[in-house]
Amino acid sequence: MAPPRNVVKIAIKMRDAIPQLIQLDQAKPLAAVLKEVCDAWSLTHSERYALQFADGHRRYITENNRAEIKNGSILCLSTAPDLEAEQLLGGLQSNSPEGRREALRRLVPLASDMIFAREVISRNGLQILGTIIEDGDDLGEVLALSLRAFSELMEHGVVSWETLSIPFVRKVVCYVNMNLMDASVPPLALGLLESVTLSSPALGQLVKSEVPLDRLLVHLQVMNQQLQTKAMALLTALLQGASPVERKHMLDYLWQRNLRQFIYKNIIHSAAPMGDEMAHHLYVLQALMLGLLEPRMRTPLDPYSQEQREQLQVLRQAAFEVEGESSGAGLSADRRRSLCAREFRKLGFSNSNPAQDLERVPPGLLALDNMLYFSRNAPSAYSRFVLENSSREDKHECPFARGSIQLTVLLCELLRVGEPCSETAQDFSPMFFGQDQSFHELFCVGIQLLNKTWKEMRATQEDFDKVMQVVREQLARTLALKPTSLELFRTKVNALTYGEVLRLRQTERLHQEGTLAPPILELREKLKPELMGLIRQQRLLRLCEGTLFRKISSRRRQDKLWFCCLSPNHKLLQYGDMEEGASPPTLESLPEQLPVADMRALLTGKDCPHVREKGSGKQNKDLYELAFSISYDRGEEEAYLNFIAPSKREFYLWTDGLSALLGSPMGSEQTRLDLEQLLTMETKLRLLELENVPIPERPPPVPPPPTNFNFCYDCSIAEP
């Protein structure tokens, strides 16, 4: 006879004792269960004990989380969290260095448990740890353990980072600025200062004033990935918290100190693979670099500005200097103005007064900056572009100014200039760290590409929008390849000619037309169930392999990782925390389990409880797109297992796999693409023998029935 649903079979162990195998009744109060367990080992005062999960972070079991205990769970009997907190805090205040060190070693693994953390915090544990950190008597293991424990306790959000004292923050800053100490201390100190900077603007200003940028550069140049990542994290946090003017000064100084070259040579092109955290911080740094262009992009040209009028004249003279000098000599003011207006028209401005063209925002003054940069840094290419087009047949000239304005808008859209940084994105372009003035240099490549494509298309003024669509496609396809240098980008984008774009479009069109014939559609419909089963199998296999997820709180992007996978029999989701850089854990080492039978629904996007309170700002758009949750039964309550996918592809794979486990359709974009690819391949295989045989649009007509059904048989023929 099967046991009741609320009874689970578990093992409980204790040091120097024979483990107990019991049937735990989840309806029985936890205090009564503890009393029975203690009685079996002849232990008195059961209120002094508590149960913990034996695996992972040894979390304490309470009435709130006891539903996580499943059949086969292994628990251990340990000291109650309040008594354990008192003992460890007593050890921290002892005069014995060894006793303090041992207490810290026991405190660190328990600090991630909310129950234990509350007990420590309520007993002034943070103040005790803060005193140890401020005293700095031991710059080795004791300090490292103290910083780790302090950060773990603060991560629970029970105490605000804004409550930290200025002397404490300054002491942590000292550990960042010091040289002689244990190698594990600087990354922990940098991580703590990053949390302070992101959470408290006032303390963030203190950190910015106390931590020299040169010191962060020193940490970045140490060939230690963890130290480099933490230094880059603090650097991007300081940049994000700075005003636009301060941010520009900071970035200018960092570029003067060759940070860009160091990142390009020693981080991007490092022999060791780049971690996800570093990729995210490089994405943020790139977004902040491009964000410096936003004020110019949002500012229209001021027709009353003497400086801007002079810049326009410089642009005109760089193209028509000889012609202007020879033809303008001795002319009246009206004739000279008429000549200038005609030359601005030749430059490709739509109006004789170029200020009217540059009043549009975006791109505003950024388009003028790009044109000036091109004329000054590639004068021969600039003159050739303008003079070549001004001498072409009417309506066939490529308008330089109009093309520059539209190209600047296009580049701002492709590179998302001025958009808020995503909390999870890792999509940076190595090319931007390999070149000074990368945006302007990219414009120089793009404007010459525009002229080249214009000639290939033999375009007229009426074809301007069509040409810009082709140029957008050329630039977008090449940027997606993530070229590592501007020269490589130039080579690849010039190889993508208009003819190649047409070929790609024709291939896509023929592919689409070939798959829309009625017989092909019927064949595809017959193949769909089998191929959907294949996709379902692949999704479940991917879940069995497991994925490393990153924990993200409502406050900031965190460094903690956890691993989740599906058991081989597809009956359990197993998960647990792990350190970055560690090898994938085995199923046996994952402490948490969620039976598939207990899963009720899959939630995505803003419906997920862990992103519901984060607001609706643009900066959270990417977070919503990667968030999903599983609701499941935990006793009489509904609980959630929350995920933030590391990428859009992982989001699709996991939501598809979980939908398959729940018996729901797999409706992701990735499933549609995979199904389309499989259908195309399978259809082509089925039609190999029909090459050069036309496939009719309609099936052959069914012949009319005979006039009668009087069939004739020759009965004289003997059957064999």
UniProtKB/Swiss-Prot annotation:
One GO cellular component term: cytoplasm
Keyword annotations: Apoptosis, Cytoplasm, Phagocytosis, SH3-binding
Domain PH: 542-664
Pfam families assigned to the protein according to its UniProt record, in alphabetical order: ELMO_ARM (PF11841), ELMO_CED12 (PF04727), PH_12 (PF16457)
Domain of life of the native organism: Eukaryota
Any one GO biological process: apoptotic process
Main location: cytoplasm
Protein name: Engulfment and cell motility protein 3
Organism in which the protein naturally occurs: Homo sapiens
Gene that this polypeptide is encoded by: ELMO3
